[in-house]
């Protein structure tokens, strides 16, 4: 079977902004003002697409309960108000629309709670390159006292911790709301929960949209560690953002 080597034109970088995941309980929902109180000093911004779910706080997985009436799991809503100092959040069913009418506070008995999170990875435009490296540490467990033989003995190791690092370079534009601009700000975000990258090695479209079934990618929650900007009269303005995985990456290299 003939094979085709991939080039950089097959790749892409998608991102979820930092500080865009928060939790709240039934007592944090106010009927009448359509307000939910999540954590303070997150990084939710007006226009951000978000989804709601019920999670088990002890595992981080799916929980048992019912979202406040007016909100549906799997539906994309849009932030119309978030006050960092109080954590007050309002959302609408459409970008720039009016607040969703919340008619009850839902049900979520401990350890269950409600979660709001950025809806999906989004394409970062004007990216010129990205790189990602992973490694594993090894712990030396070599022992002495073995019988000598013809050859020198070899050391023995067991697995230690994994780690990784990456970077992405994007050209700056005059679009205030571009994700490349937001990545710079996210470096200094104290609570980076929600930040994540999806690094496509082979992005494939089907029916006019990206098909993750046919594409190949690496995805992970991330911590942004630094950003470097450069401005010269001879080159396009660019920013390089450095990051590391905050958990085990998911490798999807199978087109099925």
Q: Where are each of the predicted segments found?
A:
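Oligomerization/assembly interface segments of phage tail-like spikes and tubes
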Residues: 153-178, 234-250
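Short beta-strand and beta-hairpin "edge-sheet" elements
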Residues: 125-127, 200-253
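Compositionally biased, intrinsically disordered low-complexity segments enriched in polar/Pro/Gly
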Residues: 1-18, 251-256
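Small/polar beta-strand repeat architecture
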Residues: 5-8, 16-153
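Generic short beta-strand segments
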Residues: 50-57, 169-173, 200-204, 225
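Short glycine/proline/serine/threonine-rich loop/turn segments at secondary-structure transition edges
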Residues: 176-192
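Extended, low-complexity, turn-rich repeat/linker tracts enriched in Gly/Pro/Ser/Thr and Asp/Glu
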Residues: 58-61, 174-178, 208-209
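Short structured motifs
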Residues: 150-154, 225-228
């Amino acid at each position: 079977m003939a094979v085709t080597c991939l080039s950089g034109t097959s790749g892409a970088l998608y991102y979820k902004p930092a500080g865009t995941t928060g939790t709240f309980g039934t007592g944090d929902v106010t009927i009448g003002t359509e307000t939910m109180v999540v954590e303070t000093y997150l990084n939710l911004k007006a226009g951000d697409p978000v989804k709601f779910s019920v999670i088990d706080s002890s595992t981080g997985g799916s929980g048992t309960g019912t979202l406040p009436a007016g909100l549906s799991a799997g539906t994309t809503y849009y932030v119309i108000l978030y006050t960092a100092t109080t954590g007050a959040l309002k959302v609408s069913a459409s970008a720039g629309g009016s607040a969703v009418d919340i008619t009850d506070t839902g049900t979520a008995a401990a350890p269950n709670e409600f979660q709001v999170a950025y809806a999906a990875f989004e394409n970062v435009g004007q990216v010129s390159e990205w790189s990602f490296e992973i490694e594993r540490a090894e712990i030396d467990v070599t022992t002495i006292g073995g019988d000598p033989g013809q050859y020198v003995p070899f050391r023995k190791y067991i697995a230690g911790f994994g780690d990784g690092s990456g970077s992405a370079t994007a050209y700056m534009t005059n679009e205030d709301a571009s994700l490349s601009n937001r990545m710079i700000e996210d470096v200094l975000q104290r609570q980076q929960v929600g930040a994540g990258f999806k690094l496509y090695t082979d992005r494939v479209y089907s029916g006019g949209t990206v098909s993750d079934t046919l594409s190949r990618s690496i995805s992970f929650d991330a911590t942004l560690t630094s950003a470097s900007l450069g401005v010269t009269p001879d080159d396009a303005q660019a920013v390089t953002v450095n990051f590391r995985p905050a958990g085990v990456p998911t490798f999807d290299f199978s087109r099925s």
